[in-house]
Amino acid sequence: MRGIAQCQDYLNMKQDNLYQQIHSMKNLFFAFKKARKGKTKKYYVKRFEKCLIKQLLTLSIELKSQKYSQEPLRTFILRDPKTRKISKSTFRDRVVHHAIVRIMDPIFDKNFIYDSCANRKGKGNLFALKRFDLFKRKITNNLNSKAFCLKADIKHYFQEVNHKILLTAIERKIKDEKVMWLIKQILGGGRTRQRYAFRQSYIPVFRKYLS
């Protein structure tokens, strides 16, 4: 907690462009708070927080100098109930993910349709349920007639996303070359032998920008 309090000294930094906003101490601090939400007792969060200013300063310097690269992923098997191979990024890298999203979200969010609910502020499960109930009643004449609802899932979506199409969609809105460099670093993974795993882990960060 002491590290968090000390970080308040950096919160008044003013930045001019998108990339500077991403690697600012202010943004990285709030990204850290977002990344640790619900995980404050995890050992890796406590370890990061123990030297918080040093960790965030290091990230800021690496990002500013464009020397940042992702750390190796932790891979494990999840059964819920189907078996899936999950590749999980380190907490340090998750802070960077949240730092990017905090700056990019306001740019893209206004272009999404009203009923797009995934990973949007103020539009969680409850909002989706209320909208579903509204449409259900509308299409069934207040439950007086039959209707159909399609539930679908795209198999291996994250692994199969075309990077060229995704980057083109992002570039329509993001003109900062350094931001695009960072996004390409994340999507590329930085380590060829882990490319498939990195795709699984990092594409979800940008998936909604395809909407």
Q: What do these predicted regions represent?
A:
Residues R84-I113, R193-S211:
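Conserved pre-motif C helix in the palm subdomain of viral-like polymerases
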Residues M1-L57:
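Non-catalytic, polymerase-adjacent accessory regions of viral genome-replication enzymes
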Residues L59-K82, V95, R102, K136-R137, ...:
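Reverse-transcriptase-like RNA-dependent polymerase core
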Residues F48, R120-G122, R199-I203:
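Conserved, non-catalytic sequence blocks in retroelement Pol enzymes and Pol-derived host proteins
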Residues K34-R47, F76-S87, I113-D115:
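Glycine-/proline-rich flexible loop or hinge segments
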